[in-house]
Regions:
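C-terminal functional module detector
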Residues: 39-43, 47-53, 58-217
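Catalytic cores of extracellular degradative/oxidative enzymes
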Residues: 1-52
Length: 217
């Protein structure tokens, strides 16, 4: 509940004191267009200089309708050993945008040596996307998006039985830009998941350094 200031009688236009936002909900798993429409709102935050982490979750209330883990958020942590999970490190990594959202494929992005959540200097940089998926999953495109615009894309069919797909591109990065990777397919993953669900995944950004503060709404 927002408290209205006594003197002005006006509440702030927006609350931006949060670290993450849900972009991909299990209810939208059958509609990539619905996910992309929410991504556009996220892009607006990024364009304004707010480094808000994108997340996804299955929103499972009933196992017979919503499979747990579709989609899910992968967060980079120091160790894959669950017994060594450091909750503080996990939370800090999520706050620093070191996360991937996916309903199937696992996609990573690097710009030179920078990883998801890192920052790079402006200039001509090499971006590299790697996508991993099981043999039965359709991965029909891999794409690089720079500040909301597609700047590189490859489309399938990829080699049958292939487990990985790669995309490289040279990007002219300007101050304040951000870059993400997207991968997905058109064939639904039935019967392993409920009918109508295609694979879709995207990364959080790699940011381009800028000497400016976020836009004040």
């Amino acid at each position: 509940r927002e408290r209205i200031p006594d003197l002005t009688g006006r509440a702030p236009w927006a609350r931006l004191d949060f670290d993450a936002i849900e972009i991909f909900n299990g209810d939208d798993a059958v509609s990539v267009a619905a996910v992309e429409s929410v991504m556009k709102d996220w892009y607006a935050f990024l364009d304004a200089g707010y480094r808000i982490t994108a997340t996804g979750n299955s929103d499972s209330h009933r196992a017979i309708f919503h499979e747990p883990g579709l989609p899910r958020t992968y967060v980079k942590v120091p160790s894959d050993d669950v017994s060594k999970l450091d909750q503080r490190a996990f939370i800090e990594s999520l706050r620093k945008n070191r996360a991937i959202v996916s309903s199937g494929p696992f996609v990573t992005l690097r710009i030179d040596e920078a990883f998801i959540g890192d920052s790079v200097a402006p200039g001509l940089r090499r971006a590299r996307v790697e996508v991993s998926a099981p043999r039965w999953m359709d991965i029909s495109f891999v794409e690089i998006v720079q500040k909301g615009k597609s700047v590189a894309r490859i489309e399938a069919p990829f080699e049958p039985m292939a487990l990985t797909a790669e995309l490289e591109a040279m990007l002219d990065l300007r101050p304040g830009d951000w870059v993400i990777a997207i991968a997905g397919g058109t064939k639904e993953m039935d019967p392993l998941y409920r009918r109508g669900v295609p694979p879709y995944a995207f990364t959080n950004p790699i940011f381009v350094e800028a000497d400016r503060r976020p836009v004040n709404p």
